[in-house]
Amino acid sequence: MTKTEKKLRHYITKAIADYKLLDKGDKVMLCLSGGKDSFGLLKVLHGLIEDKTYDIDLHVYTLDQSQPGWDDSQLRKYLDDLGVSYEIETKNTYGVIIDKVPEGKTYCSLCSRLRRGNIYRYAKEHKMDKIILGHHHDDLIQSLLMSILYQGQIKSMPPKFVTQDGENTVIRPMVLVQERDLIEFAKEENFPIIPCNLCGSQENLKRKKVKKLIQDLALENPKVPSNILNSLSNVLPSHLMDKNLLNSLEN
C-alpha cells in the first residue's frame, strides 16, 4: 500500500466516523463517473471492505449519458478485475442537454440535474440504503464560495443529507480528502479514466474561476483552503444576519 493510499484511507475513515456515514449491513451504491475522484474512492473503500473495516454491501453504478466518444470497455474490465457488483446504465441525457441548452451556455446545471435524477431513481428502484458520491475537500470549499458569490447563500456540500422526498440518503466520505492526493493516487493506480467531453470542453465555468481564486489566495497564505473548509464546522450564528437564526438565539 502506497503512502498516498494510506493517507486517503486515514481521511476517508475519519470522515465516516466523524459524521456517522456508514452502518453495519448498509446496502450502498457508489456512483462511479469514470473520473479520478470516484475511482480513488472506489479503490480505497473496496480495500476497506476487503480487510473487514466495514461490513457493507457495495454496488457500483455508472451512468452512460450517451456522450460522443464514450467508451467504457476499460472501465468494465477494471470493475470485473476488481470483482465488484456493478451496472452501467445508458440514458440519453446528452441529447436532452444539447436540445435544451442554448449555444454558448454551459451544460453543467442541466447535466447535473439529469444525472442526479437518474441516480436517485436507480437507488430507490434497487432499495439502496445510501448513495456514495466522490466529492472532496476542494469541491466543498469551491461550492461554498460559489454559493456566496453567485447565489447569495451560505451553503456547501454536506457529508450526509437526506433528499427532500425523504427517499434517499447521500453521503460523501471524501470531504476531508484534498484533490492533489487523488491526482497522485490516480497516477499511481493508472485508473482507466474516461474524460468528460461535454462540460470538460467548456472553459468559462464559474467553478474554474473560483478554483483559480482559491489557488491565487493560497499562494499568499497556504492556510486559505483549510480555513475555508474549517469555517463550515465553525459557524457563529450570532455574527450573521439571518433573522430566523437570530430570533431562535433570542428565544
From Swiss-Prot:
InterPro entries: Rossmann-like_a/b/a_fold, TilS/TtcA_N, tRNA_Cyd_32_2_STrfase, tRNA_thiolation_TtcA_Ctu1. Keywords: 4Fe-4S, ATP-binding, Cytoplasm, Iron, Iron-sulfur, Magnesium, Metal-binding, Nucleotide-binding, RNA-binding, Transferase, tRNA processing, tRNA-binding. It holds the Pfam family ATP_bind_3. Binds 1 [4Fe-4S] cluster per subunit. The cluster is chelated by three Cys residues, the fourth Fe has a free coordination site that may bind a sulfur atom transferred from the persulfide of IscS. It is an enzyme of class 2 (transferase). The keyword Ribonucleoprotein does not apply. A motif (PP-loop motif) lies at residues 33-38. This is tRNA-cytidine(32) 2-sulfurtransferase 2. The thiolation reaction likely consists of two steps: a first activation step by ATP to form an adenylated intermediate of the target base of tRNA, and a second nucleophilic substitution step of the sulfur (S) atom supplied by the hydrosulfide attached to the Fe-S cluster. It catalyses: cytidine(32) in tRNA + S-sulfanyl-L-cysteinyl-[cysteine desulfurase] + AH2 + ATP = 2-thiocytidine(32) in tRNA + L-cysteinyl-[cysteine desulfurase] + A + AMP + diphosphate + H(+). Gene3D superfamilies: HUPs. Its cofactor is Mg(2+); [4Fe-4S] cluster. GO terms for biological process: tRNA thio-modification. One of its GO terms (cellular component) is cytoplasm. [4Fe-4S] cluster binds at C108, C111, C199. GO terms for molecular function: 4 iron, 4 sulfur cluster binding; ATP binding; magnesium ion binding; sulfurtransferase activity; tRNA binding. It comes from the Bacteria. Its EC number is 2.8.1.-. NCBIfam families: PRK10696.1. Pathway: tRNA modification. Homodimer. Belongs to the TtcA family. It is found in: Cytoplasm.
